[in-house]
Amino acid sequence: LDGSEAVVTLAHDNIRVLGRVGLLKTRKAYAVLSDNVHNNVFFYNNSVSVALRALTERLYYVKGKDGFVPCPKPTASFTLLKPILKRLRRHMPALPPVWTAEEFVQSYTGSKRKRYEAALANLERRGLRRSDGYLKTFIKAELYNGTTKKNPCPRIIQPRTPEYNIAVGVYLRPMEKLVYKAIDRLFGSHVVLKCDNMWKRAETIASYWSEFKEPAFVGLDASRFDQHTSKEALEFEHSFYEQMHSDPLFSELLRWQRDQVGFANMCDGSIKYKVEGCRASGDMNTALGNVLIMCVLTYNYLKDLPCTWRFINDGDDCGIFVEKKDLHYLSGIPAHHLAYGYEMEIE
């Protein structure tokens, strides 16, 4: 298969093409495909035009009824949720551990450990640089079925350097499972399923289902959660981490996630862009932060309902168990979450 190009229909002042150099290099992929989909399968080149479409549609604009519009911003203040963070903090250790860089590296295995060992050697040799926090953006080589997905937006991957991951990860990685347990204690039941195997998840779901006489399950799906994570949402999330670690370096590393600078070096040119907010794929706290924000938001809605409920979370996908007769109490969730910048679909 040969890679495809993209038609760019949007622009943004924070995206700048630094220059187009060289010739377009067509990506090639080899795959075994069934006859009925062969002519409809395609994937995108790692080119400037594809990157421009991906950046505009995945960072700055969302598709509305009348075309593309800016991504919604929060209309409610996240300070309204601070009391929940305070309650959550009580369920955390007084001072969560901070790993050494060596302990962080040793927590990985295989090729990832080798990559972090090389990054640690770099840090010891030249120290941490601001450029380590820049996003190094490329297009995911993902196959699409053109029959079921008409003109899909390319997916972008936005990692920072392994050196940055080590610097911030010594704080975040040992904290992650402690936060998940604290969320369970806040809710008074097992909520965060992210670390559970399939058997444990099934056991939890079956247990909650059996608690209700006429059970109903409502799935909550956040539309492009990472894109809708505003600067305000990140500040709220980061404030929780900073309650436990007041290290100025840690605060500075988190700030780099809120005021982001990215570069996309494509085969036919390069792009520089800036964006406030938005979750970057590959950040050490992507899973942790998404769980934290979604759990706090949903807890804020559920805590005062005059009915029995159970909540489960697996990142930005989550669900609620209630009695069928109480389903109407959940109808306000989309409006509630949208006030904090998140577009939700109820299933």
Residue ranges and their predicted role:
Residues 1-347:
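Viral RNA-dependent RNA polymerase
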